[in-house]
Design a protein with these regions (language model features):
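Short, hydrophobic/aromatic-rich segments at coil-to-beta transitions
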Residues: 1-11
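Acidic, low-complexity, intrinsically disordered interaction modules
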Residues: 13-95
Length: 95
């Protein structure tokens, strides 16, 4: 499994059950290798302690190219503080 995590602050904690910080994960689970649709997919997800989550999938090229592009152009550019509005404006959707 490929995976990296970081913690970000949220400016609208009321949407995240009062949490002022949430986890952001970028990953590609091994079981996705078994299907043609997801074998090269990389997912970035903002996660709460409950089932609240906002995500974005990227599946344009091969796995290594997708991973490197997502890390450089999406994951590394997530600001230290985000809002749900920012997530939606940047292509993330409710899970």
């Amino acid at each position: 499994m490929l995976k990296i995590d970081k913690t970000v602050k949220v400016s609208d904690a009321y949407r995240w059950y009062g949490q002022k910080e949430i986890e952001v994960r970028m990953w590609h689970p091994d079981y996705w290798d078994n299907t043609e649709e997801t074998k090269d997919c990389v997912r970035i997800m903002f996660m709460s302690v409950d089932d609240t989550a906002v995500y974005r999938d990227f599946n344009e090229w091969g796995l290594e190219a997708n991973w490197n592009w997502c890390k450089e152009w999406l994951f590394d550019k997530i600001p230290d503080t985000v809002s749900t509005e920012w997530m939606y404006e940047h292509g993330y959707a409710p899970f």
